[in-house]
Curated annotation (Swiss-Prot):
Residues 563-645 form the NET domain. Belongs to the BET family. This is Bromodomain-containing protein 3. Residues 452-482, 646-689 form a coiled coil. One of its GO terms (biological process) is protein localization to chromatin. Pfam families: BET, Bromodomain. Disulfide bonds: none annotated. SMART domains: BROMO (SM00297). Residues 33-139, 305-414 form the Bromo domain. GO terms for cellular component: chromatin; nucleus. It comes from Mus musculus.
Length: 726
């Protein structure tokens, strides 16, 4: 469909070819009706597409004469445009939403058939079609008639009213239009809702119960003000409708790419489940809320008591996840997975405990979460289900990871409270607590199920939960830093304890030596200080003490950095350290760079929306915490390579001083108690110890070697404090 400019109506009688009449927009003989799906098409799909910058060529039928396209109507036998579709919806022309979707498909297909694939108009049509498919994916699954088809002739009149009514339906969709009041509805219309109100049959199990006004109350004056039809859709949406795409559905045109190929919405609306549902519904005449989360879950849950500070924080996290800000990748998680509609026949065999954001919100509103950990467990269960069911390269998995990053970042900033240890804002807390929480959620859900299920079901559920745990741990292993820092930290701890004992034995001698050496070094230039620090591994015991005292004297940052990992996190990097970090990042293999980008984007709001493939890193603009996290990750990746140079250099030093040691071995063994490190016969441990306990290159080495995901940071920090104070 090439660019269109003017409607073909009113073409002057010019000799030569003329445009055929435009497609009909009303037909009294053709039965039509108003359904919740058609209302959605009118108020969400058409409205969204109409506002798009690429929509203008499709506003009106193609004017082949004006555009000089003599062969257009020979090639395109069924012209279609958005203006026609819009008018048909306004006139209740369609019987079901599938007819309307067919018109959209015809419009796009005509464009693709007539134009070349490289034409701009084709690219514009593709962009519109992608949005069209995304919106259709969110359409109500069950088609429910809003007005009976009987008063068809008169029923055209309130088309404008019905159009306004549609805005009530859109409460759970991103492009929401406020409901406009009904004006000047003729008295004939006032009886329509009454007719609609009579067939109030049973409501399917998954629909919330609706207060039904009695049929015997048809006061015409009140009805125009209270059009019973408009409020029906929110009731349908709130509980009974399953969103087409949940954790198994991507945003692209492959709506059901996860495990089913054909998009169900085209066939679903035709099913005759709908009969006459509750046409009048329970009518809360309130304009629809503008934000996504308010329309997603029924708001009937009354306040059952104040939320704790942590749960208030969790509630704000949930609201953010449901906000429009994250809608682009959060929408598959808004509603429970409708396995039947999506033809995912094995979904409930694989996923035993489905979870989604609307369920979490319902539980939050009804105060079902005793603490923040229960909330976090449900959120992580939702992501775990997604990772488990879908292949790792699936688009919905990428969306889940994005949304989980949002959650973990916010959850890590939980206000401190003694009871909530995993929620402390240490940088590694999300990762540590993540595994703990998923296991806790598994235990909770398995214990809940134990009371109601049989032994066999319990066993199968336990096996399934273990699989879930395994999937989460696999993901953790890929995302988290390698835990090779832990042994090093333990070793440092032992060495520090040993150091403390040595100090207790020969405290006076050590202090005397330390003072004398400190005075000598204080006179030396900064360059000499650096040289001494580099040679520190070959020096004797008290050089370690001297170095640590120098750091204390020169600036309190070094000693303060022992206090806690959090303080280490914020230590600024020197120019040399940044340069070294840059070199180390360049040494990383390609597959490790993704994590580097992830660390930067998760900690730097200004870079969060940048393209990961083309990100430019300016170390001068990065926060110290980001740089420290990068340093830890890079060191954990390069640790194996680093160990070899460390050991070889240690051997060289041992070889150099071997003869000396042989001659003075007895002397040095006698002085061993006076040494701070107590490692004269082995230079390697001394070097390792110094890199951790007395950082020769500045505070950064301390933070990189002593920071770990284990919970022993406080104990090692306190032991180093005591060693420094002495």
């Amino acid at each position: 469909m090439s660019t269109t400019a003017a409607a073909p109506t009113g073409i002057p009688a010019v000799p030569g070819p003329v445009n055929p009449p435009p497609p009909e927009v009303s037909n009294p003989s053709k039965p039509g009706r108003k359904t919740n799906q058609l209302q959605y098409m009118q108020n969400v799909v058409v409205k969204t597409l109409w506002k798009h910058q690429f929509a203008w060529p499709f506003y009106q039928p193609v004017d082949a004469i004006k555009l000089n396209l003599p062969d257009y109507h020979k090639i395109i036998k069924n012209p279609m445009d958005m203006g026609t579709i819009k008018k048909r919806l306004e006139n209740n022309y369609y019987w079901s939403a599938s007819e309307c979707m067919q018109d959209f498909n015809t419009m796009f297909t005509n464009c693709y058939i007539y134009n070349k694939p490289t034409d701009d108009i084709v690219l514009m049509a593709q962009a519109l079609e992608k949005i069209f498919l995304q919106k259709v994916a969110q359409m109500p699954q069950e088609e429910v008639e809003l007005l009976p088809p009987a008063p068809k002739g008169k029923g055209r009149k309130p088309a404008a009213g019905a159009q306004n009514a549609g805005s009530q339906q859109v409460a759970a969709v991103s492009s929401v239009s406020p409901a406009t009041p009904f004006q000047n509805i003729p008295p004939t219309v006032s009886q329509t809702p009454v007719i609609a109100a009579t067939p109030v049959p049973t409501i399917t199990a998954n629909v919330t119960s609706v207060p039904v006004p009695p049929p015997a109350a048809p006061p015409p004056p009140a009805t125009p003000i209270v059009p019973v039809v408009p409020p029906t859709p929110p009731v349908v949406k709130k509980k009974g409708v399953k969103r087409k795409a949940d954790t198994t559905t991507p945003t692209t045109s492959a709506i059901t790419a996860s495990r089913s190929e054909s998009p169900p919405p085209l066939s679903e609306p035709k099913q005759a489940k709908v009969v006459a549902r509750r046409e009048s519904g329970g009518r809360p005449i309130k304009p629809p809320k503008k934000d996504l989360e308010d329309g997603e879950v029924p708001q009937h849950a009354g306040k059952k008591g104040k939320l704790s500070e942590h749960l208030r924080h969790c509630d704000s996290i949930l609201r953010e996840m449901l906000s429009k800000k994250h809608a682009a990748y959060a929408w598959p998680f808004y509603k429970p997975v409708d396995a039947e509609a999506l033809e995912l026949h094995d979904y409930h065999d694989i996923i035993k405990h489905p979870m989604d954001l609307s369920t979490v919100k319902r539980k939050m509103d009804s105060r079902e979460y005793p603490d923040a950990q229960g909330f976090a467990a449900d959120i992580r269960l939702m992501f775990s289900n997604c990772y488990k069911y879908n292949p790792p390269d699936h688009e919905v998995v990428a969306m889940a990871r994005k949304l989980q990053d949002v959650f973990e970042m916010r959850f890590a900033k939980m206000p401190d409270e003694p009871m909530e240890a995993p929620a402390l804002p240490a940088p590694t807390a999300p990762i540590v607590s993540k595994g703990a929480e998923s296991s806790r959620s598994s235990e909770e859900s398995s214990s809940d199920s134990g009371s109601s299920d049989s032994e066999e079901e319990r066993a199968t559920r336990l096996a399934e939960l273990q699989e879930q745990l395994k999937a989460v741990h696999e993901q953790l292993a890929a995302l988290s830093q390698a835990p090779v820092n832990k042994p090093k930290k333990k070793k440092e701890k032992k060495e520090k304890e040993k150091k403390k004992k040595d100090k207790d034995k020969d405290k006076e001698k050590e202090k005397h030596k330390a003072k004398s050496e400190e005075e000598k070094k204080a006179k030396a230039a900064p360059a000499a200080k650096q040289a001494q620090q580099k040679k520190a591994p070959t020096k004797k015991a008290n050089s370690t003490t001297t170095a640590s005292r120098q750091l204390k004297k020169g600036g309190k940052q070094a000693s303060a950095s022992y206090d806690s990992e959090e303080e280490e996190e914020g230590l600024p990097m020197s120019y040399d350290e940044k340069r070294q970090l840059s070199l180390d990042i360049n040494r990383l293999p390609g597959e490790k760079l993704g994590r580097v980008v992830h660390i930067i984007q998760s900690r730097e709001p200004s870079l969060r929306d940048s393209n990961p493939d083309e990100i430019e890193i300016d170390f001068e603009t990065l926060k110290p915490t980001t740089l420290r996290e990068l340093e830890r990750y890079v060191k954990s990746c390069l640790q194996k390579k680093q160990r070899k140079p460390l050991s070889t250099s240690g051997k060289k030093q041992a070889a150099k001083s071997k003869e000396e040691l042989a001659q003075e071995k007895k002397k040095e063994l006698e002085k061993r108690l006076q040494d701070v490190s107590g490692q004269l016969n082995s230079k390697k441990p001394t070097k390792k110890e110094k890199s951790g306990s007395a950082p020769s290159g500045g505070p950064s080495r301390l933070s990189s070697s002593s920071s770990s995901e284990s919970a022993s940071s406080s104990s090692s920090g306190s032991s180093s404090d005591s060693s420094d104070s002495e």
